[in-house]
């Protein structure tokens, strides 16, 4: 079993309680990038229920924050998902061997395997230019 242990424990990445806009999937990605790569991603002020309003916050991730789409993921790549939606509405961090770190709505942040559940919602992997 692959075990991910964050480098810094001042802001634990695993076991967080969910809170929209403060402790959610994107804040987990931001904190991972800050702790693991010393890269500070900009915050996004998500509008509540944005994915059902047709807003596409993750669509411009590449141009806005320095990410490029990649085919073969490596540790630290952002993985994006469309979960019961027409726009990408969930993100996580690829760790290793199909294991990713994420924070789903109303759950605690955790590591999970992309298979069999999450792979059907995955849209793409994105790599930061400085990671």
Regions found by a protein language model. Give the residues of each.
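Active-site nucleophilic cysteine motif
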Residues: 18-37
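Short amphipathic alpha-helical patches
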Residues: 32, 52, 56-60, 124-128
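Residue-level marker of positions within ordered structural domains that often coincide
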Residues: 33-34, 97, 130
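Glycine-rich phosphate/pyrophosphate-binding loops
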Residues: 37-46
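...with weaker cross-activation on analogous glycine-rich loops/strands in unrelated enzymes
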Residues: 45-109, 115
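Glycine- and charge-enriched low-complexity intrinsically disordered segments
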Residues: 112-131
